[in-house]
Regions:
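Contiguous, well-folded functional domains in the mature portion of proteins
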Residues: 1-263
């Protein structure tokens, strides 16, 4: 009974957040945006629409576009770029089918990929990086490599928070939460990018599959959310850039690794 009540309240909160974020009444949406800007001390220099008056509703503001000149895309063909603005949570090798959620806490690759055995085999002993998007970050998600978007599979799940406290206390957090699994194919390297939803995430949107995207092209948006996990297969060597470290802030478009085929 307790779980039913908890789920009902969670769903009610979710629906309420969605409705509030889409309110177009100027007095309300302007108050919401101004309050958010003040609380998170957000500088709008990187965004074409700099005033709270320029946005239709709060979600329009939250998923605001960025000035492309402020996020140059690394043009090295063999580079992996950060798909988002955020903070690096973990990165490294996928070993024994496990990834670090946070220090001393693992989760299973098989579960993260929703039980897809073929993908699990291809990415076992590969590499990964997880990046957390705070509420004040830019919330559009971009292609980390050039390639064809072959899959976009939405996995239903819960809506736990994904901040530091949640990562430390909720086992298998990324597996439990709703997430969008996308797969890119390219001659140099395949790549999986997983967009993990969080509490108060209204939705995750994504672009069309079976299309070719350049590195840095917009692929999706968090309409109030969360974390991105990038996976590289076991036939690709990832040489992480010197600035890549846990708790390091990264910007969309900057190089985070050099990729090469393992012969």
């Amino acid at each position: 009974m307790f779980n039913l009540i908890q789920n009902f309240l969670s769903d009610l909160l979710q629906r309420t957040v969605i409705k509030v974020s889409l309110i177009e009444i100027k007095a309300i949406k302007n108050l919401l945006i101004r309050t958010f800007l003040k609380n998170y001390q957000i500088e709008m220099d990187d965004y074409p629409r700099k005033s709270h008056l320029d946005y239709k509703h709060f979600n329009d503001f939250f998923t605001r576009e960025i000035d492309p000149s402020k996020r140059p895309i690394d043009d090295n063909h063999n580079s992996l770029i950060s798909p988002v603005d955020g903070k690096i949570v973990e990165f490294g090798k996928i070993e024994e089918g496990r990834l670090f959620q946070i220090k001393d806490m693992h989760y299973k690759l098989h579960g993260l990929l929703d039980g897809n055995q073929t993908l699990t085999q291809n990415y076992e002993n590969g590499s990964y990086i997880s990046i957390y998007l705070a509420p004040y970050n830019y919330h559009r998600v971009h292609a980390p490599i050039k390639g064809d978007l072959k899959m976009a599979n939405m996995v239903p799940g819960e809506m736990h928070r994904v901040d530091q406290n949640a990562l430390s206390n909720i086992e298998n957090l990324y597996i439990k939460n709703q997430r969008l699994i996308t797969e890119f194919n390219d001659s140099l390297s395949d790549c999986i990018m997983i967009m993990v939803a969080a509490r108060n995430v209204a939705s995750i949107t994504h672009k069309e599959i079976n299309q070719n995207y350049e590195k840095g092209d917009e692929i999706g948006r968090f309409n109030l959310g969360s974390t991105v996990v990038v996976l590289l297969p076991n036939d690709v060597q990832a040489e992480w850039d010197h600035h890549v470290s846990i708790e390091k802030d990264v910007k969309m478009g900057e190089k985070i690794a050099q990729l090469s085929k393992i012969k």
